């Protein structure tokens, strides 16, 4: 529900409504679950798909992601009924949500990405302060080849810095200076995704109750007003 809110801009109730239709059509497993674990069938079919389509080095079977506090785990995690079905017929919204579920399921069984973090500090003669930049370079994409987790900060998702290869003691030449004026922002207002995360942290409700809880807060009682992200 959180990722559908971030990536697809679906409301919680919209996500659950679409997921219900996918379940009724037999495209996904039971969607009102708090489990993060997959069945042996899902593990084996995911491994075969990954090895056949990406190579064995991209496969890493894992099934224990840790149990959330208060989780009942009566069902396995939400997943496609058949891993080989990379797409389905249906409405554009149904196809988008299915694609999200499919990619997250398969990516969860792929190898970790390997990155190298670079931290460059640049000094100048006669200046005490140092300029600093940090970035990461992907050595092996692993699960990133298929899926990248989003955050509640669109700017963070969009920013990507690629640094050149440098060595300690290299001399650099100034090619231009640009000054940016930035201000400390007030805490962000809740989105559907961040509100669900807060409910999880406070152990309030379960996946099956998040949608009606948020609907009650916003529509039924008007405790919360939903608006655009600039307000």
Regions found by a protein language model. Name each.
Residues 1-231:
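Core catalytic DNA strand-manipulation module of type IA topoisomerases
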């Amino acid at each position: 529900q959180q990722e559908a809110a971030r990536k697809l801009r679906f409301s919680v109730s919209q996500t659950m409504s679409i997921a219900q239709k996918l379940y009724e059509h037999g495209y996904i497993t039971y969607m009102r679950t708090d489990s993060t674990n997959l069945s042996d069938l899902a593990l084996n079919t995911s491994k075969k798909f990954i090895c056949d389509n990406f190579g064995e080095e991209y496969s890493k079977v894992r099934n224990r992601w840790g149990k959330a506090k208060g989780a009942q785990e009566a069902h396995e995690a939400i997943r496609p009924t058949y891993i080989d079905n990379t797409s389905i017929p249906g409405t554009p919204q149904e196809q988008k949500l299915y694609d999200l579920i499919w990619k997250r399921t398969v990516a969860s069984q792929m190898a970790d990405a390997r990155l190298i973090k670079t931290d460059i500090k640049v000094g100048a003669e006669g200046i005490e302060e140092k300029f600093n930049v940090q970035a990461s370079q992907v050595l092996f994409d692993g699960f990133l080849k298929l899926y990248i987790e989003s955050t509640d900060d669109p700017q963070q998702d969009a920013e990507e810095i690629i640094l050149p290869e440098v060595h300690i003691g290299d001399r650099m030449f100034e090619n231009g200076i640009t000054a940016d004026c930035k201000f400390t922002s007030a805490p962000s207002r809740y989105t559907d995704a961040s509100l669900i995360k807060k409910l999880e942290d406070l152990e309030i409700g379960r996946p099956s109750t998040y949608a009606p809880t948020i609907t009650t807060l916003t529509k039924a009682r008007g405790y919360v007003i939903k608006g655009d992200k600039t307000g």
